[in-house]
Swiss-Prot record:
HAMAP family: ATP_synth_gamma_bact. Produces ATP from ADP in the presence of a proton gradient across the membrane. The gamma chain is believed to be important in regulating ATPase activity and the flow of protons through the CF(0) complex. It comes from the Bacteria. This is ATP synthase gamma chain. It is a peripheral membrane protein. It comes from Teredinibacter turnerae (strain ATCC 39867 / T7901). F-type ATPases have 2 components, CF(1) - the catalytic core - and CF(0) - the membrane proton channel. CF(1) has five subunits: alpha(3), beta(3), gamma(1), delta(1), epsilon(1). CF(0) has three main subunits: a, b and c. PANTHER family: ATP SYNTHASE GAMMA CHAIN, ATP SYNTHASE SUBUNIT GAMMA, MITOCHONDRIAL.
Length: 286
């Protein structure tokens, strides 16, 4: 059994760590609320943009945009949104597993994949597994902007336009609630018509000044809005996961302190009992 002094040192060290994890939990909770607000602000725009392009994909276009036209899949691209920092539980690991499963389905068909990484953790992981990373972005901060994402997104859009990839997906975490974040892999390009409910109320558009000019701009805005919303939502997921992870660490530290305190009391009791035994034994000898 460890000595009382050693146990006291361990208890002191764990208490210091507990203070840190407790502070990180509170900071993450505050950041999560702000990230949730940003996520909710952008959702209506992203959702409406998705509806509009869904209608367009289902309509009879006078101009068939490249992003709407289906073609034979020879190469697939992924935009993977991860975090720059760790200490957020299994958030990144679960996402990476989902992406690997999805990409393996294409690999089994003999189709190669390219990756655009957003977040340092994703870049490090996919480099370690030998993935072909064509673009990467890190240190986007807690308040990302569309302008900071344009460069990486443009790499994938140019690749699609040049025929280097024939299908593009965005991969991120979906914020269900504070306790639950689920990985998702969504198809970005080519656009596919929305579900039957939208088909029933779909319509054709009149384009001014002309369909090509309007759709060329609209499609790029659509991709940017979907990727940006994925980044913002992933940020909320990160803070929620970190808050839960730090709460779990704080609780575990408390349990460990209680166990060590009990061990310390037992060690102290044993030491006192031994001293009394020695005193009694010495007195009896006299």
């Amino acid at each position: 059994m460890a000595s009382g002094k050693e146990i006291r040192t361990k208890i002191g060290s764990i208490k210091n760590t507990q203070k840190i994890t407790s502070a990180m939990e509170m900071v993450a909770a505050s950041k999560m609320r702000k990230a949730q607000d940003r996520m909710e602000v952008g959702k209506p725009y992203a959702r409406r943009m998705r509806e509009v392009v869904g209608h367009i994909a289902a309509g009879n276009l006078e101009y068939q945009h490249l992003y709407i036209t289906e073609r034979e899949v020879k190469r697939v691209g992924y935009i993977v949104v991860s975090t720059d920092r760790g200490l957020c539980g299994g958030l990144n690991v679960n996402l990476f597993k989902a992406v690997l499963r999805h990409s393996k389905e294409w690999a089994d068909k003999g189709i190669e994949t390219d990756f655009c990484m957003v977040g340092a953790k994703g870049t490090a992981f996919f480099k370690s597994v030998g993935a072909n990373i064509v673009a990467s972005l890190r240190d986007i901060g807690e308040q990302p902007s569309i302008t900071s994402l344009i460069g990486s997104v443009k790499v994938m859009l140019d690749a699609f336009a040049d025929g280097k990839i024939d299908r593009l997906y965005v991969c991120s975490n979906d914020f269900v609630n504070t306790m639950t974040q689920t990985p998702k892999v969504e198809r970005l390009l080519p656009l596919k018509p929305e579900d039957g409910a939208i088909h029933k109320r779909s319509w054709d558009y009149l384009y001014e000044p002309d369909a090509k000019e309007l759709l060329d701009g609209l499609m790029v805005r659509y991709i940017e809005s979907q990727v940006f919303q994925a980044v913002v939502e992933n940020g909320a997921c990160e803070q929620a996961a970190r808050m839960i992870a730090m709460k779990s660490a704080t609780d575990n530290a408390g349990n460990l302190i209680n166990e060590l305190q009990l061990a310390y009391n037992k060690a102290r009791q044993a030491a006192i009992t031994q001293e009394l035994s020695e005193i009694v034994g010495g007195a009896a000898a006299v």
